[in-house]
């Protein structure tokens, strides 16, 4: 199940997202489903497991991992994030990074930078 794009950032989406994360085994979280937890990050972290995938772009990433330095490489960023959560991470950007639950990292050098722009959606 995919949740997040265009969902809004209020209490309702947070409540729905929490319910889905508890009840649905395989979930992809993007956009609003991630950033609605910006004031309750520990709750988000606790709900993520090996069957969940988060797909932030850089701006969303720093909202859900505010303590991770912005001036380090994206590979270092996702490695630091992996210490906080137990899920898969797709960090969207000109070179999209994929960090699997088992800690393997794949770099997609062929992703389009236009698709990593806020609001472009996940095409």
Regions found by a protein language model. Name each.
Residues 112-123:
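Short glycine/threonine-rich catalytic loop with a Thr-x-Gly-x-Asp
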Residues 1-110:
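Glycine-rich phosphate/dinucleotide-binding loop and adjoining beta-alpha-beta core of small-molecule
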């Amino acid at each position: 199940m995919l949740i997040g794009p265009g969902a809004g950032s209020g209490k309702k989406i947070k409540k729905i997202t929490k319910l889905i994360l508890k009840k649905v085994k395989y979930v992809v979280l993007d956009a609003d489903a991630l950033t609605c937890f910006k004031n309750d990050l520990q709750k988000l972290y606790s709900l993520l497991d090996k069957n969940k995938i988060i797909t932030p772009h850089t701006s969303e990433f720093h909202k859900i991992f505010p303590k991770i330095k912005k001036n380090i490489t994206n590979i270092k960023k996702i490695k630091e994030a992996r210490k906080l959560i137990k899920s898969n991470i797709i960090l969207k950007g000109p070179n999209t990074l994929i960090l699997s639950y088992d800690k393997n990292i794949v770099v997609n050098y062929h992703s389009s930078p236009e698709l990593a722009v806020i609001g472009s959606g996940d095409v």
